[in-house]
């Protein structure tokens, strides 16, 4: 059974997540004044405090069969344009079953004239009006672009009134300033396998009012290429190369004609792109937005992106260009909803029961967050869950700037190691526990022995932290591939123990050295940890300096004043050991590396006091400080630099 463009386009749109306008919206505005559904439009203006906004008009795809799908067009990519600072005008047009061509392009022209005639009413800056559409909306958008200034045109015996006289703003211009065509049908004479006309029941036959093959003049009149000249606006054309509805060649023909006239900025081919799915993606949306911004003389911006830690297909939380995070929570019966992300943010409830808020800018990298619903702290079901803060939490990932991004991302051209979970029964506690072990690329076949970094998490976390939140394997893979770090094994134990040193020496090291090909001397061992794990590292390495040649302490230090929850929390027994033999420790520890997340790090004052005492004793150490507080972005960076100092 033949599937129409309309049905496939509708199905494709159903797969896309809806954006929601923020404020200043006008719905079902009658741009002609005749009360017809096909003559309604919606206006969405950004809620950014600006008095006016440049405009982008949206046209839906429906094979010209629908007269009321303007909401679908906005759901497709209207929010992206709104986020980029444009006022968005999503329009209906008459269906092909109620009015034949050129009624649809006349509707588009009338809507644009209405926008210009009412610019001050809606706060629209009509010095720039862009237009975009998908499928049949791509056709109408393209036709609107190539017919700037065209009132009528004759093709053979057919004279076509392109402009029309609809509405009361006939003296306004219907010209557009830039066009993005998403997989629109262009040449109706080559819709069947890029060779010939489709049959007499095709959507294009319906809008023409007869079989395409019998109406070649009208086919030419519908073809945007029939009107191309060097005065047309610039175009961006986007098409998936596996589109089963509108042949990919349609955009090839169109792009070539535009390029020949100097009117094509780019033709984007989406590999394996379908009629909507795959072709619609964050990258192509970004390209569309930046194209319109360039043409409008605006600064290019980066669109809000779903957090990399969202569950599949969840749009929120979204990360804005400046590091702020947008949240949406569907909780219609809740009385109060908050986001706990470094601080509490009250959310605002909409009429649809959806709560929203935008946070302050967050630093790069991973951050825990919670939902607080009527006073109950819970993980967000839209996010992956992580064990932190002594409970299962949610996480949001803030993109790194370009100069750091390569450190923390998977790369196709890098050989990757493996992280394995090993279950074992502790000889110290009798409990069954886990240890996560990273082995570098090539470990399985090299036959070599490797040094080991024993790497500990912080309080409220467990053995999963460095692998999941810390990206240990990615950091080491990239450093090793670049020759900046020696190939090494990394062992990540559960540090929630009454006697960590006993478990490390009795369980951890023997297990790793018996199951893996390791170096078994101090020269082949390093010990490091963050926060609580940093104190465990200090205590263990100072009491057993003969076992480790490299020591790393991240965002940690003994307390300036004794704490009741931790034995020897002020570190006095360990200071005494160091004071007895500073030269010995300086010789034993080839690298004693201390890092801190700046003044905002909760361990900063403790660490500062500890380092001052080290200096008084003559204990040599390296110190690195980076802004970010007591957070995983700081600890990832600590590992990144510490790993480069090991086993050399």
Q: What label would you give each PLM region?
A:
Residues 1-7:
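Positively charged n-region of N-terminal signal peptides that target proteins for export
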Residues 9-19:
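Bacterial N-terminal signal peptides
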Residues 21-23:
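Boundary at the C-terminal end of the N-terminal hydrophobic targeting segment
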Residues 29-32, 38-39, 46-47, 54-76, ...:
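Non-catalytic cap/lid and distal C-terminal segments of serine-dependent acyl enzymes
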Residues 150-176:
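A conserved active-site-flanking secondary-structure segment within enzyme catalytic domains
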Residues 301-328:
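Extracellular ectodomain segments of secreted/surface proteins
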